[in-house]
Design a protein with these regions (language model features):
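Tryptophan-paired
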Residues: 1-25, 78, 83-198
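Structured interaction patches on ligand/partner-binding surfaces of diverse proteins
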Residues: 20-62, 179-194, 198
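Solvent-exposed, conformationally flexible loop/turn segments
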Residues: 47-49, 53-61, 129-136, 197-199, ...
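Interdomain boundary/hinge segments at the C-termini of tandem beta-sandwich modules
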Residues: 54-56, 67-70
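Outer-membrane beta-barrel proteins
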Residues: 65, 159, 236-238
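A short, Gly/Thr-enriched small/hydrophobic beta-strand-prone motif that recurs across taxa
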Residues: 69-82, 240-248
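Exposed beta-strand and adjacent loop surfaces of beta-rich binding modules
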Residues: 74, 87-92, 166-168, 213-215, ...
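Low-complexity, acidic Ser/Thr/Pro-rich "mucin-like" tracts of secreted and single-pass surface proteins
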Residues: 185-260
């Protein structure tokens, strides 16, 4: 890139992979500029801000090397089911509590605590080949939700103790007629920290060892469906008209997950 300017000190703002020209904007407008989270990225948005001094020179002045940084965090996960639970199968994975917007050039001064500023990533339904193990990568904007110093055991890094808008991975599995949900919060450690910074990389190696709901990160329910159609059945068909009922019974020990 070549451009002409008078000698002096300048603040240089650079954006990459946005797919659009930002146009002419003041310094304050650039600092306030936000971008929207995307479900998929062909290229990751990047940015940089640097102060440069241009000295008087009759020739060409070469600026210092400028490094752009990603405005997103990379979340990689590797999930496997332990051999001791051969009847437990993975069903889906979803990244939840994803910030919808972020400023392009400046890190967040404070995290949002309003749920309307967050969304969930699309549900990743797992194929039959991934019932016992799966891997994937997701991207999200920074979400520095802080720390909770009272958490001393990773089993207590759960919805009861986490900040309301902290980001987490929701894993759905099945064991027999039980549906299980495993909630794994992001952060810089396995206990107190719920911070996700821009231009960071997080790798979650998760081993599911069972459906023990003593671990407060695990929620499950058993669903049974019965009917009284038998008296009106002919082969595989039910004869109409008749009065019959379909019974749905849900058994669980906790109020979560919410069922609709």
């Amino acid at each position: 890139v070549r451009f002409e300017c008078l000698p002096g000190e300048y603040d240089l703002y650079v954006a990459a992979n946005l797919g659009a020209d930002l146009g002419e904007r003041s310094a304050q407008q650039l600092l306030d500029y936000t971008i929207k989270w995307q479900e998929e990225y062909a290229t990751l948005p990047m940015s940089a801000v640097m102060t440069v001094a241009i000295a008087p020179d009759k020739g060409t002045v070469t600026l210092p090397t400028l490094s752009v940084r990603r405005t997103v965090a990379k979340i990689a996960y590797n999930i496997r089911v332990a051999d001791k639970v051969p009847d437990l199968e993975l069903r889906s994975v979803r990244l939840c509590s994803v910030p919808e917007y972020t400023t392009l050039f400046t890190p967040a001064s404070a995290p949002s605590t309003s749920e309307k500023d967050f969304t969930d990533a699309p549900l990743v339904e797992l194929p039959d080949a991934a019932r016992r193990s799966c891997s994937g990568v997701q991207y999200l904007f920074e979400n520095p939700q802080g720390t909770v110093s009272s958490i001393t055991d990773q089993r207590d890094k759960n919805a009861d103790n986490a900040p309301a808008c902290a980001s987490y991975l929701m894993i759905r599995a099945a064991r027999g007629n039980r549906t299980l949900y495993y909630r794994v919060y992001l952060g810089r450690n396995n206990t107190t920290d719920f911070n996700v910074g821009r231009n960071t990389s997080h790798t979650l190696d998760i081993t599911i060892s069972g459906d023990n709901e003593v671990d407060t990160r695990v929620h499950g329910y058993t669903l049974s469906v019965t009917d009284d159609f038998e008296s009106n059945r002919i082969g595989d068909y039910c004869v109409l008209p008749f009065n019959a009922s379909l019974y749905v019974n849900i058994e669980r020990t906790k109020s979560e997950p919410t069922l609709t």
